[in-house]
Amino acid sequence: MTVDFGRVLTAMVSPFDKNMELNLPMARKLARHLVDSGSDGLVVCGTTGESPTLSKEEKLELFRTVVDEVGGRAVVVAGTGSYSTKDSIALTQAAEKLGVDAVMLVCPYYNKPSQDGLYQHFRAVAESTNLPVMIYNIPGRTSINLLPQTCARLAEIGNIVAIKEASGNMDQATELRRLLPDHFHIYSGDDSMTLPLLAVGGKGVVSVAAHLVGGKIQEMINAFTSGNITLAAKLHSSLFPLIKGLFMTTNPVPVKAALGMLGLNVGPPRLPLVEATEQEKEKLRVLLREAQLL
């Protein structure tokens, strides 16, 4: 299976109202805004979408809403992975019925499976669906690192077609590209690593910063792919302060605050995350002004 998700996918936040319930009208508005401002696709209910705090029913509501709003205009990738293989299969199959274009499966967190356990988990979920699958490796959150050799085994499964690589290790990214077939796409899971990953054969990024600067990220990637490395590096440097600022505390706390400042009231995060402090908000305002967004 050969699939092109595009270059810039936004890891979309999950909007909440004042009662901390899903704000589906805002989810529609945000999805439209992201696609209109440069996103090729949206990843719904991933880390940035606070997936662990959402019930299965809430996740399905978000999948349904985003597909209805931007399906056909952008790729909709449903975050259906968890530490339970059985639950991941059930959510994946339910998401498929709603018309999502693909699923993203995070490495099982907390229970720390072996490399063979990771392989068996991803294979079982992939074999339960006809959808293309993107694997999500983020050892800083899951405490387990999917090794390139394991990913290469998984790439032999027909519908496992991409990885969101957020190890932050360029040696690992290089080894992934060396071992994986050309049609298997590698996406950066860290905005600050997008340009370095492109340099070793990456496809694009699953981005937090694209909530705010999706067009600029597209411009940077286009500059790189057209051979204008100097311009790509200049754009990377200009985006870097804002990108780092969006991780001054746990994601998605800063990006939710920033969206609110720009008139997209997506609400605060659910507990156990808490909203940005006044000091953090002031730092964000400065960064948004410097980026000419405020």
Swiss-Prot record:
The gene is dapA. Pathway: Amino-acid biosynthesis; L-lysine biosynthesis via DAP pathway; (S)-tetrahydrodipicolinate from L-aspartate: step 3/4. It comes from Desulforudis audaxviator (strain MP104C). It catalyses: L-aspartate 4-semialdehyde + pyruvate = (2S,4S)-4-hydroxy-2,3,4,5-tetrahydrodipicolinate + H2O + H(+). CDD domains: DHDPS (cd00950). Catalyzes the condensation of (S)-aspartate-beta-semialdehyde [(S)-ASA] and pyruvate to 4-hydroxy-tetrahydrodipicolinate (HTPA). The active site is at Y136, K164. This is 4-hydroxy-tetrahydrodipicolinate synthase. It is found in: Cytoplasm. Coiled coil: none annotated. Belongs to the DapA family.
